Amino acid sequence: MDDRKFSVLIAGGGSTYTPGIVLTLLDHIQKFPLRKLKFYDIDGERQQRVADACEILVKERAPEVEFLATTDPEEAFTDVDFVMAQIRVGKYAMRSLDEKIPLKHGVVGQETTGPGGIAYGLRSIPGVIGLVDYMEKYSPNAWMLNYSNPAAIVAEATRRLRPHSRIINICDMPIGIMDRMAQIVGLKDRNDLVFRYYGLNHFGWWTDVRDKTGKDLMPALKQYVAKNGYWLGDKDKDTEASWVSTFKKAADVYALDPSTLPNTYLKYYLYPKYVVEHSDPNYTRTDEVEAYREKHVFDECDRIIAAGTAADTHFKSDDHATYIVDLCTAIAYDTKQRMLAIVPNDGAIENIDPEAMVEVPCLFGANGAERLAMGKAATFQKGLITEQNCVEKLTVDAFEQQSYTKLWEAMSLCKIVPDASVAKEILDEMVVANKDYWPELK
């Protein structure tokens, strides 16, 4: 490695994930040296609570690193090497509607899947495109690592609208599952695994998992998942109830195709009736997040600020943050590390549309992602992927063309919506709810 130090901007500085990312950057500062750390958010008040706590963290652990929090795009995006984008357009108020409106109609209400994911996607596209434009204007040589949801729709939009931008779309969900896999087979973490995986974001399958010696771990993993899903028993005692349910339900998703291991989000598409029956339309995942994660993170920020020290902080590194830092390091030092990303298919999955934005292993280096070939999708997976990818493309069509019909088609095609009349009822309600965020549909 050389003597370079990097300037990093976290766009969406008020996110509850920000302290974990900061802590991870500081923990890995020998591997990925920093000269400057900046936060950017359009909600200055929310960001400031996080920033004041994180500034204490930075000053105590790496006083040589310059720290800045701002709501000014020019100040934020000037002189940066990496932008970590984690915005939520409409905040939790809109996420709550994304979940609760479909549930009123007996349809899965979820942040990134189904009608809720489509609604969120339409809000997110201009927000992420705006960040890309700021980066290209003020730091044209920077890389953006985008993990703003819904990643699949955002990735399709950036492919079309900013095809030459230095943006890498990523998601931490498979990473978290792989850490669980490592625990199931008694390994330290996901970095001890060598894997093959393919699909769309929140919509994929592992076809092979091995350790570094080449030992096939699939038989042991399948035996465990068939009985327990990805639930880790006593190790999950502090895990939120909705996630425990999701990890356990992976056993039923696995049963549909015992030749692979599934992403947990497939439960929404394959068992929507079960999901709706086990949902409370008056208390959804948003309410759980606000009661648990939001409260915990902001209480801890306030405690650090009041104490004037972060020496005894409860914040810690997590899958989400470690993955992002590993990716920055791979690009900065051209390591060719193998990691998952959402990229144009271009033959990676042989029998899927070459323009589809697929999630596959890539080698990361100074020029970004080099996708690896995963062969052909099986018939079951091919059918699911093709349908869902068309939903994502129609959503971006709707944005580009400001088309009500395209958005209705997207919701009608979505596997978890029973028919076009229900899709229209949900859509009409969502048009009103999103009037301040969506383009005016014709």
Swiss-Prot record:
The activity regulation comment is: Is inhibited by EDTA in vitro.
Q: Where is the active site?
A: 172 (proton donor), 265 (proton acceptor)
Q: Which cofactor does it need?
A: Mn(2+); Co(2+); Ni(2+); Fe(2+)
Question: SUPFAM superfamilies under this entry?
Answer: LDH C-terminal domain-like (SSF56327), NAD(P)-binding Rossmann-fold domains (SSF51735)
Is Metal-binding among the key words of this record? yes
**Site feature (Increases basicity of active site Tyr) residues:** 111
What InterPro entries does the database record attribute to this sequence? Answer: GlycHydrolase_4_CS (IPR019802), Glyco_hydro_4 (IPR001088), Glyco_hydro_4_C (IPR022616), Lactate_DH/Glyco_Ohase_4_C (IPR015955), NAD(P)-bd_dom_sf (IPR036291)
User: What family is this protein classified in?
Assistant: Belongs to the glycosyl hydrolase 4 family.
- What does it do? Is probably involved in the catabolism of alpha-glycosides accumulated via a phosphoenolpyruvate-dependent phosphotransferase system (PEP-PTS). Hydrolyzes a wide variety of 6-phospho-alpha-D-glucosides including the five isomeric derivatives of sucrose, i.e. trehalulose-6'-phosphate, turanose-6'-phosphate, maltulose-6'-phosphate, leucrose-6'-phosphate, and palatinose-6'-phosphate, but is not active on sucrose-6-phosphate. Can also hydrolyze maltose-6'-phosphate and methyl-alpha-glucose-6-phosphate, and poorly, trehalose-6-phosphate.
* Protein name in the entry: 6-phospho-alpha-glucosidase 1
